[in-house]
From Swiss-Prot:
Name recorded for this polypeptide: Phosphopantetheine adenylyltransferase
Similarity comment: family membership: Belongs to the eukaryotic CoaD family.
Biochemical pathway: Cofactor biosynthesis; coenzyme A biosynthesis
Catalytic reaction equation(s): (R)-4'-phosphopantetheine + ATP + H(+) = 3'-dephospho-CoA + diphosphate
Annotated compartments: Cytoplasm
GO BP term, example: coenzyme A biosynthetic process
HAMAP family: PPAT_arch (MF_00647)
EC number from the UniProt entry: 2.7.7.3
Role, per record: Reversibly transfers an adenylyl group from ATP to 4'-phosphopantetheine, yielding dephospho-CoA (dPCoA) and pyrophosphate.
Species of provenance: Pyrobaculum aerophilum (strain ATCC 51768 / DSM 7523 / JCM 9630 / CIP 104966 / NBRC 100827 / IM2)
Cellular component, GO, one term: cytoplasm
Keyword Aminoacyl-tRNA synthetase: no
Domain of life the protein comes from: Archaea
A GO MF term: pantetheine-phosphate adenylyltransferase activity
Amino acid sequence: MKYKFRNVVLGGTFDTLHSGHVKLLATATLIGDRILIGLTSDSFASTYKQYKVRPFSVRLANLRNLMSLIAPEREVAYVEIHDPYGPAVFDPRLEAIVASIETAPRALQINDERAKRGLRPMEVFIISTVRDGYGHTLSSTYIRRVLERPESKQS
């Protein structure tokens, strides 16, 4: 199968995997032959998350398992990122970036950084938000908060 782009990138913390992550990852597999996923390091995640995320090794294993279900035939590379940009700002092979509405500004910043380095901008694909049955935006943080509510705990 011929895909629109040879090399597609996306990134995130991927702590508690949910359908929003599936949508993001599936979009990348629909448009790209090779997928590069930037996964935040534990130290970088601790700078912007208000809670302790799962260890990098656990998040990576979960992400690999999910990608093997979404696109088992696809070539996927994983890279640990220590800043908001990762290799997206310096890898000239990257042609497209997939982002959520929440992370779209970061994708545009990445393209600005690429331009400063003399690299062509990537095409930006923005996916819509996934909501739960009550209209709340799904995120790892939201899921964690719901699970921590006293009424959520089973005795």
